[in-house]
Amino acid sequence: MRVAVSNLTFGYDYRTVLKDISFRLNSGDFLAIIGNNGSGKSTLVKCILGINKVPSGRISLDDIDITEYHNFKNVGYVPQKFDEFNYEFPITVNEILQVSKYSKVTEDEKLELLDKIGILEIQNENINNLSGGQLQRVFIVRSLMNNPKLLILDEPTVGVDAQNVENFYQTVNELNAEGITIMLITHNIRESNAKFTHMLSLHNGEALFKEVPRGDEE
């Protein structure tokens, strides 16, 4: 999926968070979004997802202006925190995948995705028994059930141990190699072995956008 952000400005009350942000991605690109806490990373993602109404500027997905027409059918999103579930209540991986619109996929398609992401064997596990890395993979599977052309990941490795961080980025690299455009927010770009094609650095609401060689995070 192609992504184009043009002259995006956004703020809360009297504070401007994003100032005249512009960048463009082609299908299959892999963007790292970096910046300090409060720099506007999550705000930018919420604008792209249509959660924040954009007062100034333009965002288009595959050349469709989402500020005028919502075009999120093929957009997957993995949040940093999964607040929609009460983890004190017993719920299994399968039950998470069966709720809401994601239950529309067939059983065979679901099993294929679980196997692809490497968590087929835990499909009947209670989520309280999962590691941080396993839980992240569960929600990647859920996002892939939407058959996304764009996958947005918000700080996906927070609280995940080093080995699972490496495994996670290997999975993301493989998804990107299949042609999925990926936007990934990270607070520590050096921890990843992700094969980024572009980097967007946010500071005080302003952005520096650049192309980087595959796998070069410097």
Model-derived features: positions:
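Helix-to-loop junction immediately C-terminal to a conserved catalytic motif
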Residues: L49
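H-loop/switch region of ABC-family ATPase nucleotide-binding domains
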Residues: T186-H187
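Catalytic Walker B motif of ABC-type/P-loop ATPase nucleotide-binding domains
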Residues: L151-D154
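Conserved ABC ATPase "signature" region
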Residues: E107-I122
